[in-house]
């Protein structure tokens, strides 16, 4: 009886492994490539080294023009910020955010590319930062 269960388990495992990998391939980052062509940013935030937001109000995201306008508090250290993106399902971001990012060069705004789940659609977003004037 144990022999039958082991054989059945082995057969089920082989079937599961061989059929599971055929539907959606995996990209170079280990993420599934899907059929989704949607490609947009749904939310954006900047946090300081204390992981608290530095933005004033909501970020204005224009998914047609591919721009993000955000106002940060006066005195914010623009050289040490963590950008936080919320993307549509299955999309990914380039370059990858690996830690603190320098946003201090306001004349040359940072750009990030959102890539759809299908990897067929790419949109490059420009982040414009305005520093709130001191009161």
Describe these PLM feature segments.
Residues 16-20:
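C-terminal motif of bacterial Sec signal peptides marking the signal peptidase cleavage site
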Residues 21-135:
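Beta-rich interaction/scaffold domains
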Residues 11-15:
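Alpha-helical transmembrane segments
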Residues 1-8:
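Bacterial N-terminal signal peptides that target proteins for export
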């Amino acid at each position: 009886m144990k022999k039958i269960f082991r054989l059945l388990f082995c057969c089920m495992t082989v079937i599961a492994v061989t059929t599971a990998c055929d539907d959606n391939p995996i990209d170079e980052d280990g993420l599934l490539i899907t059929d989704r062509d949607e490609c947009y940013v749904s939310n954006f935030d900047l946090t300081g080294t204390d992981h608290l937001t530095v933005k004033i109000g909501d970020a204005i995201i224009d998914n047609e023009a591919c721009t993000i306008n955000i106002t940060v508090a006066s005195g914010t250290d623009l050289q040490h910020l963590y950008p936080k993106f919320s993307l549509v399902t299955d999309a990914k971001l380039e370059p990858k955010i690996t830690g603190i990012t320098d946003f201090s060069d306001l004349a040359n705004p940072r750009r990030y590319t959102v890539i759809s789940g299908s990897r067929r659609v790419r949109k490059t977003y420009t982040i414009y930062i305005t520093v709130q004037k001191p009161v």
